[in-house]
Regions:
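C-terminal segment of N-terminal export signals and the immediately downstream linker at the start
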Residues: 1, 5, 21-56
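N-terminal export signals
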Residues: 7-26, 110
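Short alpha-helical hairpin
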Residues: 28, 62-69
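Structural motif
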Residues: 38-44, 61-62, 123-128
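Mature-region segments of soluble proteins
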Residues: 48, 66-153
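Long, well-ordered alpha/beta core segments of mature domains
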Residues: 53, 57-65
């Protein structure tokens, strides 16, 4: 199975899971008093995690479509404070595991080490991790370049 087929299948399978109440209720008014903003360090980490999941090959990667910037908007505007905290905890978990396994921050590791770390930390039962993974796929697949690279139309 090539990368294009894999991304397409993942999108189809997780599509139903991904469209949750947050997106259905995103038009509802929300008090932003408790809204968090991703720091520059967390944005950089998210960009590198995104590129690890969807790397640039003969097609564009997640960094090229600015998946992290899109995710930051959704994070700030749609996620509840609890979901934001879960998401940040998942980002920190990846970085902490990188320090444990490879002795350095995730963003400083080689692509091969990043994949190794990511495979050790991924846990679909972790709400924050699942949200992060799904948002990366969603951001990529809803971008023009990501859609053109992944689907034939």
């Amino acid at each position: 199975m090539n990368r294009r087929e894999l991304i397409k299948n993942i999108a189809i399978i997780s599509g139903g899971l991904f469209i949750g109440s947050n997106f259905l209720l995103s038009s509802c008014k929300r008090d932003d008093a408790g809204s968090l903003v991703l720091s520059e360090d967390l944005m950089n980490l998210l960009a590198e995690i995104s590129e690890t999941i969807i790397p640039e090959t003969d097609t564009v990667g997640a960094k090229s479509v600015k998946a992290a910037a899109f995710i930051a908007l959704v994070f700030q505007d749609i996620y509840s404070e609890e979901e934001q905290n879960d998401f940040i905890a998942a980002l920190n978990l990846v970085n902490d595991k990188a320090k444990e396994v490879a002795g350095d921050d995730f963003i400083k590791l080689s692509a091969e080490k990043r994949v190794e770390v990511f495979n050790k930390v991924k846990d679909p039962k972790n709400k924050g991790f699942l949200a992060m993974y799904q948002m990366i796929l969603f951001a990529y697949l809803t971008s023009e370049k990501g859609m053109q690279a992944s689907f034939r139309y």
